[in-house]
Each structure stands twice: as C-alpha cells, then as structure tokens.
Amino acid sequence: MDAERKKAEGTEKAVAEKGGRRRSAARDLCRIALFAAVIAVCAWISVPVGEIPVTLQTMGVCLAAAFLGWKRGTAAVAVYILLGLCGVPVFAGFTGGIAKLVLPTGGYIVGFLFTALIVGGASDAVGERIKNTWARAGILAAAMAVGITVCYAFGTGWFLALYRMSDRAMTLAGALSMCVVPYLLPDLVKIVAAVLIVSAMKKYVRK
C-alpha cells in the first residue's frame, strides 16, 4: 500500500510540475507578445526629424528588457522585428517590410536586439540583490544609456555605409551630426521615463 501511495503521489507531483511548466510557458509567451505590441505602439509615436524620426522605440525596447530580462526581453524585440520584416506595419510611420533594412534606419532595427541584451542582462544581474531603489535605478539607467549607445553605433554605421555605397559624400562627423546629436536629449528623457516606469511598476511584474 505504501509503495502504491508513493507511486500515486509521485505521479500527481509530476503532473502538477508539467502543468506548472505549461502555465509558465504560456505566461512567458503572453508577456513576450505584450511587449512586442508595446514596442510597436512606441514606434508609431514619432516626430519627423530629417531622415531619421524621433520615436519611442528605444524606450519600448528598454522597458521590454528591463521587465522581462535578457532572454524574454530580446525575444520580444525579435518578435517585433520579425513582424515588421514580414510586412506588418509595426515600424515607425506605420510601415513594415524587409526593405526597411536597406533604408537609413535599418541599422537601428538591428541595434535594438543588442540594446535588449544589454538592458535585460543588467536587469537580471540586479534582480532582487540590490535593495536600494536609487542604486537599482542608477544601474538600469546606465545600462539603458550603454544599450542605446550601441544602437547608435549600428544605426550610424549603417547610415554611413548606405551613403557611401550610393556614391554620396559623407564623413563620420557628418553621420554623427545626423544620426546621434539631434537625438541625445530625447533619448535622455526616454531613459529617465523608462527608469521611472520600471521603478514604479516592477513590483507588479514577476519574472
């Protein structure tokens, strides 16, 4: 009888664990889809500035990574990018399609993945180990700044390469003046806003 009872208990435990894994996987998929949608909405909020509009995309990417961590945050960004490349109008200006990669903003799209990796990695590293709210906010803000800088690097490099391939004269200084300088202040504001949102809402989102 004891053996049968232990076997039954083991079976029940295995079934419960399997059900828990399924629920966890379903919850992860829902969160990934939700933040992919958040990034899309952020992309639609844009202000035309030269060839590269000011959008809230980077803030959406930072929020996804900060809330979900590097694995699921990067997955959310990847889903967003794949939807856009498949033609779903999730990019800035309600646009989509693989042709976006050969436009001046194509490098930023690739850079979003690395921004998510950096910010998500910092979020995972901080976890619950750092209790001080200001310290956590400072680490996240620094990670977002680094992540967006990496995105700048991809965007500027892509922009410069496209200009040179089209036989148009463009120096690195010129590319920086078009791809980075006009966006420094807006991105600083977005970092502050993202950190405030994460600090206020993190306790309601369990990883």
What are these regions (language model features)?
Residues E4-K6, G10-G19, L34, V41, ...:
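Short helix-perturbing small/polar motifs within transmembrane alpha-helices
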Residues S24-F35, Q57-V61, G73, P104, ...:
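Residue-level signature of transmembrane alpha-helical entry/exit and packing/kink sites
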Residues R31-A36, V90-F94, A169-M170:
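Short hydrophobic/aromatic-rich motifs at helix boundaries and adjacent loops
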Residues L34, A78-L82, G106, F114, ...:
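Hydrophobic residues within alpha-helical transmembrane segments
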Residues A43-G121:
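Alpha-helical membrane segments and adjacent membrane-interface helices in multi-pass membrane proteins
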Residues F94, I130-K207:
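Membrane-embedded alpha-helical hairpins and interfacial helices in multi-pass inner-membrane proteins
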